[in-house]
Amino acid sequence: MKIFSISNQKGGVGKTTTSVNLAASLALNKQKVLLIDLDPQGNASSGAGIDKLTLNNSIYETLIGQETINDVVRASEDNMFDIAPANQSLAGAEIEMVNIDHREYILKNAFKTLKKTYDYILIDCPPALNLLTVNALAASDSVIIPMQCEYYALEGLSDLVNTIKKVKKSLNPDIEIEGLLRTLFDRRN
């Protein structure tokens, strides 16, 4: 099983679009895929056809210890891949996670039960360098960094790379940057 985080603390760079399309592409190639929506906006969930307003269980419940990952996973609307959906309740997860021992490893520990179930787990990260993102990085083998083709995108990239280095040093020595993915490319610029 290979675990990828799709991460960039800058919003609007194509993390969710990349995550959903990569999940669908891998599924079309006969791979068993789980998409984790770790963004409180829940757009990956919407993209997978999940109604965020009627969710009973989401990744939030897994992060705060109320449900296992297996309890929150459901099929995407088209049954191509599975998803652990998110909604606005995820915005409060960090406050509740603060008092949990080894809180940086909640996702990593949750994934242990999935080893033989999926070929790939893709984590759509929030647009922030917060505890949710640290959880994703601590659980991942690799990071894909979607990045707009513009000068200011480089400023945020160094912050993300430094965070990944810190995670590699203290939480996950095996994590690697898989690569940068140029998004929103305009030949005129």
Language model segments and positions:
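P-loop NTP-binding core
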Residues: 1-189
